[in-house]
Amino acid sequence: MAMGRESDRQGDLMVSWAEMPRSPGHVFYDRLQEVLIAGGFDLFVETACQPYYAPKMGAPSVPPGRYFRMHMVGYFEGIASERGIAWRCADSHSLRDFLRLENREEVPDHSWLSKTRRRLPHEVHESVFGWVLQLVAEQGLVKGKRIGVDASTMEANAALRTIVRRDDGRTYREMLTQMAKESGIETPTADDLVRIDRARKSKKLSNEDWISKTDPQAKIAKLKDGRTHLAYKPEHAVDLDTGIIVAAALHPADNGDTTTIAGTLSAAEKNLAQIDAAPTKDKPSELVADKGYHSRAVLKDLNGGVWKTRIAEPKHPGFSRWHGDDKARAAVYANRTRLGSGVGKEAMRRRAEIVERSFAHNLDRGGMRRTWLRGRENVHKRYLVHVAGHNLGILMRLLIGAGTPREAAAPALTYLLFIYTEQTVALILVVASDDGFAILVMSLMIQPDQTGTSATGCYPNAGLDPMPASEIPKAAHAVECFG
């Protein structure tokens, strides 16, 4: 066989449709496509977006369903920037199929994503989030009985060096330069400014005094890793029984937890009402949160309403003084009683696992720990579709056993162990993947006076949430415990 050379190749003058390259298919995106098409996703999106396009005049736009699909790809692939999303979609035949592109169509440019986001209002993005919530609720993934609330930080697309004083518009460097001149240094160097900044007593950057010229809505805050940066505050309301996010709010980073919880709960009630799962006074839902949300005002407002609080209480030195506020005392004591029960302790453990996991998936693995957009409304539009992708991932894990494309493509390892003793014969099947591992145990106990007895134990996600063998029917012939 002769060696082929790149220099000897001649380009094709014509290519038939059958010879054009196409995707062999992706198990995750193909199944997700079936779910979206069966649910009428494109028709719903086009109907919701129709009022914001010209009725007749003008060239037809790119279908808006493609806009939301590309942002879902951003979540599943962990891509933060819209430019990166466009590059990734153009580089994959399977993603081209997921976007429903024809052979001659190109992947929309990243600038089209920005233009479409500016064209479509916030309400359309909320409606898409609600459509996905309705879809997962039809599969029984929204219980609405226990809701966990927590917040995190999202780094804004603005640097601290862009902040200026609200009163006179001076930058931080200009302020230090003026202080140096007042101290007798006519032409201060960079080292002089650093020395003056270190010696300055009042070094706290206050949002009341400073604002960013690049993103005025971003606030100075301390991030989870300890750095001080301009940021936003995403807050989740999560169904603790399934992990579905029922509300994803985005607040200013300088607002405390006790200030933002009312808006997040209002959004959760609205979204749950659309799927007939809203809490009522007769059937309240449990609200589980950490001690950052504990305050007398919050507990008093929620007591006797549609939320039954289980909010962790910080330790206070001494005795509580109520000053005649009997409603606050009753609310605090009722919350403390519910929190101390076994159900309350289990709910707090569940909150720490499920709610924190939602931030890990959306911010860290999903690529939204730092946003590349500016303006709280723009960031929230992108984040709502991002979280909708998270909820679809949970649905996909129910349907095919994998919540991300990487997990679906990862091979599962299977181990078969055979253990034999004088009185027992055991068969152990271990299936492991990136998501965890499961164990199937089948044993045969040999006794002198009997032919034998058998027992079967199934341990899904072994090591994390084991299921006792006593809960599995004995003498089972086949048990499916992984997937």
Give each language-model segment a name:
Residues 1-22, 408:
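Short, flexible loop/hinge motifs at secondary-structure junctions
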Residues 2, 15, 21, 73, ...:
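Position-driven detector of the extreme protein N-terminus
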Residues 6, 21, 25, 165-169:
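Intrinsic-disorder-associated interaction segments
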Residues 8, 47, 71, 96-114:
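Peripheral, non-cofactor segments flanking catalytic/redox cores
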Residues 22, 26-72, 77, 379:
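Basic, short loop/linker segments at the boundary and entry of helix-turn-helix/winged-helix-like folds
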Residues 73-76, 91, 95:
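Amphipathic alpha-helical interaction surfaces
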Residues 78-90, 101-483:
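Anion-binding and metal-coordination hotspots
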